[in-house]
């Protein structure tokens, strides 16, 4: 899915940083009073690269529609959580074709661990997230060989708006999934 799923599927974006600190993009998310959210994604130069719009149904399943900078739909993601608190997200392209998924669980310390697979079920990478006492979340991404390829850091302000910064160990590598 576009470069390690474009390098890894993590579709709640934030500003990321990697070992070498190349800023490769950011996103800002706004959530309305109905709980629906809209994210605007930008590249390292601040140019808009696309948007994501999410809503959650009465069953607690979240559907996200991804659009490019011209507003064209390029894919969707559907997230569900089981009775054990494990989360599965399935990704589809603009034609509805299955292109991969992610599976997450949260440990007893509140850290989230995620594995990613492509459309054929092959393992493509993983990520690990933790949230500090200030509510800031840091995520580290690794490829299918366990090599760290980047990271992201997210902060939610008092209005509930979330900003994420992304950094990669390669200036040409994106961690975004879309």
Language-model features: where?
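Hydrophobic h-region of N-terminal signal peptides that target proteins for export
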Residues: 10-18
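A periodicity- and composition-biased signal for non-globular, repetitive helical segments
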Residues: 8-9, 48
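Sec-dependent signal peptide recognition
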Residues: 2-8
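Repetitive, compositionally biased segments used for assembly/scaffolding
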Residues: 20-178
């Amino acid at each position: 899915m576009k470069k390690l799923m474009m390098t890894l599927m993590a579709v709640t974006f934030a500003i990321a940083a990697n070992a070498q600190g190349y800023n490769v993009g950011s996103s800002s998310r706004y959530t309305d009073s109905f709980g629906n959210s809209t994210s605007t994604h930008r590249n390292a130069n601040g140019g808009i690269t696309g948007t994501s719009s999410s809503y959650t149904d009465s069953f607690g399943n979240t559907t996200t529609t991804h659009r490019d900078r011209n507003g064209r739909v390029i894919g969707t993601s559907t997230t569900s959580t089981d009775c054990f608190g494990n989360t599965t997200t399935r990704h589809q392209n603009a034609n509805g074709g299955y292109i991969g998924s992610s599976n997450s669980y949260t440990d007893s310390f509140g850290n989230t661990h995620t594995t990613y697979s492509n459309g054929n079920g092959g393992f493509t990478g993983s990520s690990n997230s933790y949230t500090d006492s200030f509510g800031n979340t840091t995520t580290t991404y690794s490829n299918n060989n366990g090599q760290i390829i980047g990271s992201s850091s997210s902060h939610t302000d008092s209005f509930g708006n979330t900003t994420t910064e992304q950094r990669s160990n390669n200036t040409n590598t994106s961690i975004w999934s879309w």
